[in-house]
Amino acid sequence: MLVSGPSAIFEAVHRSLEGMAADLWYLGEREDLAAALKIFGNSMLFAMTGGIADILAMAKNLGVAPEDAISVFSRFNAAGALSARAQKIAHGDFSASFELTMARKDMRLMLDAAGDQPLVALPAIARRMDEAIANGHGKDDLGAIAAASLPEKR
């Protein structure tokens, strides 16, 4: 359970909250922080679900069974890269481990693989890639698609 707000109130109720949740995470005084982090977590869940939908759309167009399409994740652990990639991006570190122009080539292959199947996430990501490349990030890491979402450096 994510909790934020005045510490005096948290101290008064934390024992009761511990009985309701296996994991209690007090985030500090900022009252809206728990709600913000909750929607950030849900956002990742939605992004993953959209990604799975797009994988299944490509699979459908290519005649690959859904079970076979998702079997790649028994060997390719994308979740394992999440924390490290997120930290790099959050710090504005776009040193390339997967160059954006190469990622955009793969994106073209994905869009082609989907054919006329409806896609959830890939077209929006492709547009953001094109914007980042146009803004000079082509040789940077794929994470540079988040550059416009970061605060301005001072």
Model segments located where?
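Helical "substrate-binding/catalytic lid" subdomain
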Residues: 33-145, 149-152
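Acidic-glycine-rich active-site phosphate/pyrophosphate-binding loop
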Residues: 14-31, 78-87
